[in-house]
Amino acid sequence: MAFRKSNVYLSLVNSYIIDSPQPSSINYWWNMGSLLGLCLVIQIVTGIFMAMHYSSNIELAFSSVEHIMRDVHNGYILRYLHANGASFFFMVMFMHMAKGLYYGSYRSPRVTLWNVGVIIFILTIATAFLGYCCVYGQMSHWGATVITNLFSAIPFVGNDIVSWLWGGFSVSNPTIQRFFALHYLVPFIIAAMVIMHLMALHIHGSSNPLGITGNLDRIPMHSYFIFKDLVTVFLFMLILALFVFYSPNTLGQNMALLLITYVINILCAVCWKSLFIKYQWKIYNKTTYYFIIQNILNTKQLNNFVLKFNWTKQYNKMNIVSDLFNPNRVKYYYKEDNQQVTNMNSSNTHLTSNKKNLLVDTSETTRTTKNKFNYLLNIFNMKKMNQIITKRHYSIYKDSNIRFNQWLAGLIDGDGYFCITKNKYASCEITVELKDEKMLRQIQDKFGGSVKLRSGVKAIRYRLQNKEGMIKLINAVNGNIRNSKRLVQFNKVCILLNIDFKEPIKLTKDNAWFMGFFDADGTINYYYSGKLKIRPQLTISVTNKYLHDVEYYREVFGGNIYFDKAKNGYFKWSINNKELHNIFYTYNKSCPSKSNKGKRLFLIDKFYYLYDLLAFKAPHNTALYKAWLKFNEKWNNN
């Protein structure tokens, strides 16, 4: 007798994997089970290694995730494998369940097998929810609050159960820590349930597409179905690797899983009364099944339903449809805190510099150029400009070289990249919206390269691949790139081109452009009190990655920095009193902005002037009140 059959432990492996008799007619839909086992192993292994570096404390969770992504060797691969593996886990599980529904795998004598699978499905969803809440993920605190509040529907004791789950009066540190503990524990319970699932499967064996007993024609699992499983395993690993390494955040959308899904799966095993089995022999049932699957595949977020009705004409007037369905609606050109989201000034398209250095003589962005100086910029060179412009306005241009380089480096940080092709030459690519074509055209005039329309999307791409242009571009942005991933690429390109790599400069009041905050992630609003607005407030939200930069501005301008739990772990810096606003307003006079938020900033001094006059509550029919209404309309229009 073979050793694999005589050994106590190997005989179990032999009966389940090697000599297990399988129907010869099963197709590739039966490969989903082996893929689910692979997904479970990937999730457990990557989860264990990430847990070695992750901290579940609410104050450290976000920082520990950043630590995994930046400092842990291949930590970003672990995290993306875990996140995308979870998405593929559910995809394969849904296909596995669809196969069971289509081929009637829930019927007797496999009722226990089906019910154990439903329990595994529920535990998997619970594990995914706990994981989303741990690291300020998709659901975050809001999702944890909503889902746990479902228990409040239980009569009499519902609210007490919710408080017990939270460990307090709201989702806080105890909640996240216990969620992480359960997120670590439940996968091992799932693994135990998988063993029970295999035990139930081993009793009656697999079903088959024909719907008849498979005992008439069975073949051993090895080597026939083992190699058949390996085909889908390699295909699965290839597709998973494509998402992990090339598009790791594509599958990060929320998935709404309804309770009715569990009920249907459980009732399928007890409600089937037909003498005939399997949908493939029933035309009407088969058609209905395909309609259900098509409906699930076409399900989208609620706002996308606007396209399916005649509401489009009504929304077009408010420009809502274009915003909802713009793929870049929440994407800034670059996300670094010291760079700004801006368009190149159209009036400077033919402006050139006679100097040999790579720095521009005048600012080429909409923040550093006022309209009344555009004509002068196009006629006079910098020497004549210095004689004409007063000292007050000259401060606008004195740091233009640094600002242009930071702005260009910001493009590369946010939506462009450096790369080396086959260790032969370096290249740089930048992608922007169509309306910003002039911006790329001016970069093309300065450094060379090509500008082309991207197919399939409303975007335009700048590409630079010649050595001379790359040397000029690198010298222009060297020391200004702050994104860690781009720094790695930038360093490799510098080595290839024999250029000294410069570390990112530290932000100061002289070399950082503060107005960029308010276009990318800052607001300038008014607080309301009744009908009159009390005071303006300026707010910036950043992650802990940029906290040290914001702390510098707190030292310069004052204000407060606090941790906002409701905004996915962001730090907020805000100033909201007249003295600090005056300091901030005076500083930004040298950095004019044409963005809507920048226009509001320069209305602050007028706001305080009018508000001080209105302090005595003038009657609403006076000229002073009418002046206030006129100012209010101007503020809203900006």
Swiss-Prot record:
Q: Which InterPro entries match?
A: Cyt_b/b6_N (IPR005797), Cytb/b6-like_sf (IPR027387), Cytochrome_b_N_euk/bac (IPR048259), Di-haem_cyt_TM (IPR016174), Homing_endonucl (IPR027434), LAGLIDADG_dom (IPR004860)
Against PROSITE patterns, the record matches this protein to: CYTB_NTER (PS51002)
Q: Name one GO molecular function term.
A: endonuclease activity
Entry's Gene Ontology BP terms: Group I intron splicing; mitochondrial electron transport, ubiquinol to cytochrome c; mitochondrial mRNA processing; mRNA processing
**Annotated localization:** Mitochondrion
- Report what the Swiss-Prot or TrEMBL entry states about this protein's PTMs: The mature protein may arise from proteolytic cleavage of an in-frame translation of COB exons 1 to 4 plus intron 4, containing the bI4 open reading frame. Cleavage would take place close to the Met-385 resulting in an active maturase of about 30 kDa.
Entry's EC annotation: 3.1.-.-
Which controlled-vocabulary keywords does the entry list?
Hydrolase, Mitochondrion, mRNA processing, mRNA splicing
Task: Please give the start and end residues of each transmembrane region.
Answer: none
Region annotated COB intron 4 encoded sits at 253-638
GO terms for cellular component: mitochondrion
Q: What is its main location?
A: mitochondrion
Function, please? Mitochondrial mRNA maturase required for splicing of intron 4 of the cytochrome b (COB) gene, containing its own coding sequence, and intron 4 in COX1, coding for the related homing endonuclease aI4. In vivo splicing requires in addition the imported mitochondrial leucyl-tRNA synthetase NAM2. Both proteins seem to stimulate the intrinsic ribozyme activity of intron bI4 through binding to and stabilizing specific secondary and tertiary structure elements in the RNA.
Note, other? Residues 385 to 638 are sufficient for maturase activity.
Q: Which family does it belong to?
A: In the C-terminal section; belongs to the LAGLIDADG endonuclease family.
Protein's name in the database: Intron-encoded RNA maturase bI4
- Quick one: which gene encodes this? BI4
